[in-house]
Amino acid sequence: MNQRKSYRVPNLVIAGRVALAFVAVGLLSLPSLPAAGVAVVLIVVVIAMDGLDGILARKLGVMSDFGAVLDITADRIVEHIFWIYFAVAHQVGVWVPLVIMTRSFVVDTVRGMAFAHGKTAFGGATMMRSSVTRFLTASRFMRNLYGVSKTAAFVLLGLLMAEARANAEGGFVVPPAALGALESLADLAVVVTVALCLARGVPVVLDSRDYLFERPEPASGSGNA
């Protein structure tokens, strides 16, 4: 496999994740219990595919800064797709996607500024300055914890929508006695996910202060004659 084709493999995985996220919300929108069930499975698949492109890139020897940026962009799109949909479906308050999206735009803006200075979000050229901020933003533990919390939130919200479809058909997915517990778990997962999202975003802004408050150099030839 030549190098150009090798680059396509992880990029196709990234594109596939985004496409499956759209398919999942499309299925959740249908008034069908089987469709909702398939959507919940797809949510798990989409989140599980998060690190697959990176694994393939390392195995094929085609890791690049562009690939890392593309992966982060796909993460944002997938997150926003689900949060916006669940807000529209009245499963979460509108404040959730507003907070998540605001954090995403701010963090990605400062990361873009750091990238212009040769710094990356993760890896050897990371923009993170201290061990604490590197732990919060780039450690495997925090990334896995955030991934698990997102998966739990999206799956539980999807199950609640599947339950609504089942109720409309005169049945149920979750025993009625356990429905209240499921709703509470979903609410908790959402709050924890938002909190982790902010906890991983604030350090990025703090560690990029040199780029945010950089004083522009005067243009050459400027000054009084």
Label for each model-derived stretch:
Residues 54, 64-68, 75:
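Aspartate-rich (DDxxD/NDxxD/DxxxD) Mg2+/diphosphate-binding motifs
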Residues 2-14, 18-21, 41, 72-225:
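A feature for the membrane-embedded catalytic helix bundles of lipid/isoprenoid biosynthetic enzymes
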